[in-house]
């Protein structure tokens, strides 16, 4: 019997949610994703010490540029050991500023291209705010493909699909966390609200012929991953990838394109904002996620300033 990880790879593109090059080399994902929190962890890995020094020297005291160069350097290194793409995130503090998001995305792509990485191997990650979705729509038309993250609500998924973004990252574990805390209940299998959210989005996209890739993210256990086997892509931490690799049990495909989904429902800005307002979980987790990524970005900047 092959491992659950190898079985999963038969019908889902497996992505590593980490900046740890050793883990990526060992687990052989197709793609990899990073974010400010993961870059902060990567900065503490001894193997990145020389890279940190080099990045700071190149940035010549510009802390913002040093952070961008570090993200691109980590991403470029990862691309040497994976066949697919790297997702690199825009500063979360820009999440409500469309022009600033556009500028930062273009800067990151320019840094990648200067490092010899073509833009078709990079996905720019943006928070799934209204402004982030609008920025992504423009970037896609420029040939810069995007990954819309911190996606917790169906309204966010609807708006992303209508904007023609390349990929979305609907979160599973953080939705599970919210409902567990809110209700005091534990959720397993198909009853998990995070699993239900991604399943609903996947079925809606397939039923309506959207090309946007659905990449489930933020997992708490392999049970959640198993329930989403068949999703276009799943981005998984090294710890859970290792658990899947060590498990020889059977892993059947659950999500399939032929499953029934809801009819297409385009949203304008006021409808989007109202739908978000009505979704307490989606509103709270989006705001919390942006705050957390912003804090970690600030910590990364502090690290860059200290070592300069």
From Swiss-Prot:
Keyword Cytoplasm among UniProt keywords: yes
Record-linked InterPro entries: Aldolase_TIM, TAL/FSA, Transaldolase_1, Transaldolase_AS
UniProt catalytic activity: D-sedoheptulose 7-phosphate + D-glyceraldehyde 3-phosphate = D-erythrose 4-phosphate + beta-D-fructose 6-phosphate
GO molecular function: transaldolase activity
Keywords for the protein's UniProt record, in alphabetical order: Cytoplasm, Pentose shunt, Schiff base, Transferase
Subcellular locations according to the entry: Cytoplasm
EC number: 2.2.1.2
Classification via Pfam families: TAL_FSA (PF00923)
GO process terms (BP): carbohydrate metabolic process; pentose-phosphate shunt
Active site per UniProt: 125
Pathway membership, UniProt: Carbohydrate degradation; pentose phosphate pathway; D-glyceraldehyde 3-phosphate and beta-D-fructose 6-phosphate from D-ribose 5-phosphate and D-xylulose 5-phosphate (non-oxidative stage): step 2/3
Main location: cytoplasm
Quaternary structure, from the entry: Homodimer.
Family: Belongs to the transaldolase family. Type 1 subfamily.
Protein name (database record): Transaldolase
Organism of origin: Pseudomonas putida (strain GB-1)
Classification of source organism: Bacteria, Pseudomonadati, Pseudomonadota, Gammaproteobacteria, Pseudomonadales
Gene (UniProt): tal
